[in-house]
A protein has these predicted regions:
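Sec-dependent bacterial lipoprotein signal peptides
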Residues: 1-14
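N-terminal "domain-start" segment that seeds a small globular fold
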Residues: 16-40
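Short active-site neighborhood of thiol/selenol oxidoreductases, capturing the structured segment around
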Residues: 40-61
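Hydrophobic beta-strand anchors of alpha/beta hydrolase catalytic cores
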Residues: 49-50, 79, 125
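Structural microenvironment flanking redox-active thiols in thiol-disulfide oxidoreductases
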Residues: 61-98, 109-113
Length: 157
């Protein structure tokens, strides 16, 4: 009986334990292009893809539709666009021109999110595993390559 009581106490304490803090690179708050708050720590524990882009980048413009369609196909993966190196109006125009409504886009006006992830060129994709690990891919992958990287983030069923 005493062991049962001890076990129950341990289980209760374990249930009250605080969640481990998010890795440093996810400890940020940013604004979406619409002005809503976005917390980076919400990405931890789920597969995610961050797409770092600029409105004036020819490769970013060329791949925007493919990225949008890929996000729709991979609905169990959180996609986030991270725009930088331009003004908010240009970022909004890019999203509007490419009809990108399937996932949020952050206005990284000061480049701080790019810095957190070590991004120095665009386009860059950050593939976020559920354990918080990140793999960066700079350049324009084919649709097949993008699908392969994303499939590696999600468990096989």
């Amino acid at each position: 009986m005493r062991i049962l009581g001890l076990l129950l106490g341990v289980l209760l304490l374990a249930g009250c334990a605080e969640k481990a803090p998010a890795p440093e690179k996810f400890q940020f708050t940013a604004k979406t292009l619409e002005g809503a708050e976005f917390r980076g720590d919400k990405l931890v524990g789920q597969p995610a893809v961050l797409w770092f882009w600029t409105p004036w980048c020819p490769s970013c413009n060329a791949e925007a539709e493919m990225v949008e369609e890929t996000a729709k196909r991979h609905d169990k993966v959180q996609f986030v666009g991270v725009a930088a190196e331009d003004q908010l109006d240009a970022m909004k125009k890019f999203v509007s021109d490419h009809k990108m409504s399937g996932f949020p886009h952050l206005a990284d006006l000061d480049g701080s999110v790019w810095k957190r992830f070590g991004v120095t060129a665009q386009p860059t994709f950050a593939f976020v595993r559920t354990d918080g690990g990140v793999e960066l891919l700079t350049g324009s992958p084919t649709e097949e390559q993008l699908d392969q990287h994303i499939s590696a983030l999600t468990p096989k069923t």
